[in-house]
Design a protein with these regions (language model features):
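Adenylate-forming
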Residues: 19-25, 36, 49-53, 133, ...
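Conserved C-terminal structural/oligomerization subdomain of aldehyde/semialdehyde dehydrogenase
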Residues: 22, 75, 102, 121, ...
Length: 178
């Protein structure tokens, strides 16, 4: 990451991400779960996490059902514990930001498929976030435009390859697309 000098202040430039994972109707159906896993890894705290999943309309309902099942079975727990699961986010400030953005997604009309606000059951200590999936998102909603830096996946339907590319490229964060 490049360093810069501004007056007498040193700063580090960050390259954020709001990557899109494009799923076409002829894709391996397991690409849906793999995309969710890539979003949720590290509790979503990766600037290259594919946090927008663009799904071709002809397989959209199947994708939403698969995401619901997968996300509801996804484990959250102590990072010292053996096994596949995600741990807490970095701080109370980040936890609160994620909770605010999840609520904003609900308020803006995105359909909550799995997860939501609050902590996962049994995890009262620490800043644990429920892996969350929103359906029926459009690219103008905050959950699609803001780098949440948490385990929150926004699913956006598309009809044509050109439309998918247009949506994928319509972001202020150009770090990655899948």
């Amino acid at each position: 990451i490049p360093l810069c000098l501004v007056g007498s202040e040193m700063c580090i430039r960050d390259r954020g991400g709001k990557g899109a994972n494009i799923i076409f109707k002829d894709a391996d159906p397991e690409a849906i779960e793999r995309g969710a896993l890539r979003c949720f890894r590290n509790s979503g705290q990766s600037c290259n996490a594919p946090t927008r999943m663009l799904v071709e309309k002809s397989m959209y309902e199947e994708a939403i059902e698969r995401l619901k099942k997968y996300t509801e079975s996804f484990e959250v727990g102590d990072p010292k514990k053996e096994g596949e699961h995600i741990g807490p986010v970095i701080s109370e400030t980040q936890y609160n930001k994620i909770q605010t953005l999840i609520q904003k997604g609900i308020d803006e009309g995105a359909k909550l498929v799995a997860g939501g606000t609050g902590k996962p059951d049994g995890l009262d200590k620490g800043y644990f976030v429920k892996p969350t999936v929103f359906a029926d998102v459009n690219n103008d909603m905050d959950v699609a435009r803001t780098e949440i830096f948490g385990p929150v996946l926004s699913v956006i339907p598309f009809e044509t390859e050109e439309e998918a590319i247009k949506i994928a490229n319509d972001t202020d964060y150009g770090l990655t697309n899948y």
